[in-house]
């Protein structure tokens, strides 16, 4: 056969293939949001030769690996790739997929090219939608210039098609060091146990102010008195705290005290807000602490109040009683502590790993466990083939029964991220449901123990990559609470403005995807228009889109730019009419109502008991919003209503979120109209990054800038917990400081962890078709659940 004919055939085949690429519907993390945005009207990826995302790997020939590659999900990624038909191509999208990015941590593969061949790399964190389009055109050029498919198609020797590049080996055929080539001989400064070393540093000799101290209210004093009378020396009140009443409890009386606080105390602390542990083995004042500290945060609704309980444990394999019989929500929290710390809970109904793979060795949040992936053996293609997810049968409570067991996920169009549902079916009816999470676990709490207080801010927005700057607020407020940093009024209102813009953005994405979940595709093509308008405002103000990383300790990174108010006013003018138009598409639609009304019900009492928060809680009839109950950042100065519904079903959750958008717009309008004058960051530069103009005027500001940027500010020794009302619910940060430039313990309480744990309660007795409607109505996001 002549070369001329083969060359012509190569041209025709390459032209056909490069302009008819079929990407797989597959996403790992933040980058997938921008990948999906590339298919919306502003960008319209179809113009560039890539059509609708395909739900099955057997229908796709392009795998865009968008986001962080986790060791737990890596075998699934490999399986999806191997199920794709030849020829097939791979685009690695974003810094995390390319090389691990900012997640050099125990749970993350340092690049997808360690298990798959990669044709095109798209840099960025995350790349913009325009970068996705450029990556696609680069792949098309590669297909046209490098591939000779005719011989393969005609079963002749020679030729090439699809991905042909080799899989790389970390440390052998690619750089092992996360800082890039040429850095292998330079030791990384600092670990979770050892702070960064600066030769000749006298920082330990420097005086720093003590942590903030609060006065107990009369109600809190009464609670302390009652606990002392009831439990005697088994309960000891901590004399000084920065945020809430704190009590140390003897382990053998812990369960009694917790039960009393929930069922008999006045007020009753009905919700277990969080449960976590602290490994005390690396404390500088080691003799003052036990080996471990268990920490319980409780919440009362009437009146609004919080309390913290702590108990000390000793030994390498400590144990204490489970409290799952007091709060069912403790189930996952205790499993997480067992998984990451190795602390056992006696009487727990199912104490097994929850975040890490089932065959993982060790407990990552122990201080002696390596924090960086580059401190561990390189992850290889062989590892991905060996460490497979467990069979769905092990999750069922009746493995020998006659129920049909159905796996949904961990990669599925309707799971809204990397989450695995194991469904037991009696015909079409769901008889039981188990979830396997942890596929998106990227060790952010461990990272918080090595990054300085300022360096950790970029990680916050990535905990919920659709809530943007709203994620930063509970973190910076927790540190500000501990260090008693006063935030200027202008900075507080700017924070509110950005947080509410991201609430609108989040709910617009939810509106579109939820409508799609139940069969209405049209909203997808409309709501992203206003979302892009909101992100344009965010970009105008902060310079970023999804992850501005713009909040700072003591304020925000910069003052508002020229033109910000005009852009916000334009949004305020057009948004109400657009929202009415979108709502008219589905609110009274008989199909939508049939799919959502009476489906996925949960009572108010169950929602409280399981720790549900945000719109999902308010849809059960409880008017609970932290912006009202624990006002922060000046929210007490804004007029807005707290939307509620009483049915507790999918339709009620829809109604609450739609009305929340209207209320957020009211707050945005007030913030823009009444923006106070003044500073955008505090002038107390002991802990914050000084304004550049001040560093040019006086040496004191310049010194603070140098110290706080290099080794980080020395935040006082102590602890603080702050929770904020982000779009999906209550997100809290519990920061523990040991007087150094970074956190000793960084704990994140994500709303999705509790909201998703209740999923079996919502789904039992419903049909399998209704499960998709229930999943979408809860509005969770995986990095918030898995952290």
Swiss-Prot record:
Domain of life: Bacteria
Residue span of region Disordered: 154-205
Subcellular location as annotated: Cell inner membrane
Pfam families, per database record: Complex1_30kDa (PF00329), Complex1_49kDa (PF00346), Oxidored_q6 (PF01058)
Segments of this protein annotated with the region NADH dehydrogenase I subunit D: 407-787
Region (NADH dehydrogenase I subunit C): 225-380
Enzyme class: translocase
Assigned keywords, A-Z: Cell inner membrane, Cell membrane, Membrane, Multifunctional enzyme, NAD, Quinone, Translocase, Transport, Ubiquinone
Enzyme Commission code(s) on record: 7.1.1.-
Main subcellular location of this protein, as a coarse class: membrane
GO terms for cellular component: plasma membrane
Keyword NAD in annotation: yes
A GO molecular function held by the record: quinone binding
Sequence ranges of Polar residues compositional bias: 191-202
Catalytic reaction equation(s): a quinone + NADH + 5 H(+)(in) = a quinol + NAD(+) + 4 H(+)(out)
Region (NADH dehydrogenase I subunit B): 1-149
Known partners and oligomeric status: NDH-1 is composed of about 13 different subunits. Subunits NuoBCD, E, F, and G constitute the peripheral sector of the complex.
HAMAP family: NDH1_NuoB, NDH1_NuoC, NDH1_NuoD
Function statement: NDH-1 shuttles electrons from NADH, via FMN and iron-sulfur (Fe-S) centers, to quinones in the respiratory chain. The immediate electron acceptor for the enzyme in this species is believed to be ubiquinone. Couples the redox reaction to proton translocation (for every two electrons transferred, four hydrogen ions are translocated across the cytoplasmic membrane), and thus conserves the redox energy in a proton gradient.
Family affiliation: In the N-terminal section; belongs to the complex I 20 kDa subunit family.
Protein name: NADH-quinone oxidoreductase subunit B/C/D
């Amino acid at each position: 056969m002549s070369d001329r004919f083969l060359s012509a055939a190569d041209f025709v085949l390459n032209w056909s293939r490069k302009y008819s690429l079929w990407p797989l519907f597959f996403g790992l993390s933040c980058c997938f949001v921008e990948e999906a945005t590339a298919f919306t009207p502003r960008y319209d990826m179809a113009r560039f030769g890539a059509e609708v995302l395909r739900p099955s790997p057997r229908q796709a020939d392009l795998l865009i690996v968008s986001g962080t590659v986790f060791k737990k999900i890596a075998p699934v990624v490999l399986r999806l790739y191997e199920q794709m038909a030849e020829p097939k191509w791979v685009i690695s999208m974003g810094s995390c997929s390319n090389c691990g990015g900012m997640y050099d941590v125990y749970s993350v593969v340092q690049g997808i090219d360690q298990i798959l061949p990669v044709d095109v790399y798209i840099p960025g964190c995350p790349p913009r939608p325009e970068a996705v389009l450029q990556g696609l055109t680069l792949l098309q050029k590669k297909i046209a210039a490098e591939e000779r498919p005719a011989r393969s198609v005609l079963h002749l020797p020679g030729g090439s098609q699809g991905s042909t590049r080799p899989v790389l080996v970390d440390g052998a055929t690619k750089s092992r060091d996360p800082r890039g080539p040429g850095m292998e001989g330079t030791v990384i400064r600092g670990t979770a146990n050892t702070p960064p070393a600066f030769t000749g540093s006298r920082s330990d000799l420097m005086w720093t102010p003590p942590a903030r101290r609060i006065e107990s209210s009369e109600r809190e004093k009464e609670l302390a008195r009652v606990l002392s009378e009831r439990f005697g020396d088994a309960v000891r009140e901590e004399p000084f705290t920065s945020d809430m009443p704190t009590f140390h409890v003897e382990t053998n009386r812990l369960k009694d005290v917790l039960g009393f606080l929930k069922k008999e105390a006045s007020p009753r602390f009905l919700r277990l807000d969080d449960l976590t542990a602290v490994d005390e083995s690396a404390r500088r004042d080691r003799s003052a602490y036990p080996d471990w500290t268990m920490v319980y945060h409780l919440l009362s609704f009437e009146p609004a109040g919080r309390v913290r309980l702590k108990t000390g444990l000793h030994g390498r394999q400590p144990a204490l009683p489970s409290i799952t019989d007091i709060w069912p929500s403790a189930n996952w929290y205790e499993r997480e502590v067992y998984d990451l710390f190795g602390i056992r809970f006696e009487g727990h109904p199912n104490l097994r790993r929850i975040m890490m793979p089932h065959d993982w060795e060790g407990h990552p949040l122990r201080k002696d466990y390596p924090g960086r992936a580059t401190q561990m053996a390189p992850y290889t293609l062989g590892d991905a083939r060996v460490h497979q997810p467990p069979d769905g049968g092990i999750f069922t409570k009746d493995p020998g029964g006659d129920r049909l067991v159905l796996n949904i996920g961990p990669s599925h169009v309707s799971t809204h991220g990397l989450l695995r549902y194991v469904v037991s079916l009696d015909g079409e009816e769901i008889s039981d449901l188990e979830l396997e999470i942890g596929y998106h676990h990227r060790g952010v709490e461990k990272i918080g123990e090595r990054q300085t207080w300022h360096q950790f801010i970029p990680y916050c927005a990535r905990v919920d990559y659709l809530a943007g700057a709203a994620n930063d607020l509970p973190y910076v407020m927790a540190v500000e609470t501990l260090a008693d940093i006063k935030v200027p009024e202008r900075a507080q209102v700017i924070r509110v403005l950005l947080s509410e813009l991201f609430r609108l953005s989040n709910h617009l994405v939810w509106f579109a995807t939820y409508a799609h979940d139940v069969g209405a595709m049209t909203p997808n093509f409309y709501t992203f228009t206003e979302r892009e308008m909101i992100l344009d405002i965010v970009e105008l103000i902060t310079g970023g889109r999804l992850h501005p990383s713009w909040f700072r300790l003591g304020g925000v990174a910069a003052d508002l730019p020229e033109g910000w108010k005009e852009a916000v006013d334009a949004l305020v003018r057009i948004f109400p009419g657009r929202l009415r138009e979108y709502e008219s598409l589905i609110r009274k639609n008989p199909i939508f109502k049939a799919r959502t009304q009476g489906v996925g019900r949960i009572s108010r009492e169950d929602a409280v008991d399981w720790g549900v928060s945000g719109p999902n809680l308010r849809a059960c009839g409880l008017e609970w919003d932290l912006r009202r109950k624990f006002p922060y950042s000046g929210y007490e100065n804004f007029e807005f209503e707290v939307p509620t519904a009483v049915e507790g079903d999918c339709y009620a959750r829809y109604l609450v979120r739609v009305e929340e958008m209207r209320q957020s717009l009211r707050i945005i309008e007030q913030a823009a109209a009444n923006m106070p004058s003044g500073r955008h960051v505090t002038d107390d530069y002991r802990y914050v990054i000084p304004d550049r103009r001040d560093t040019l005027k006086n040496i004191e500001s310049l010194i603070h800038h140098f110290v706080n940027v290099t080794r980080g500010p020395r935040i006082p020794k102590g602890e603080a917990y702050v929770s904020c009302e982000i779009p999906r619910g209550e997100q809290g940060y519990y920061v523990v400081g040991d007087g150094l430039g970074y956190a000793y313990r960084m704990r994140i309480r994500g709303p999705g962890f509790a909201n998703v744990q209740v999923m079996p309660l919502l789904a039992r007795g419903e049909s399998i078709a209704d499960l998709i409607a229930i999943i979408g109505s809860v509005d969770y996001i995986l990095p918030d659940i898995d952290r």
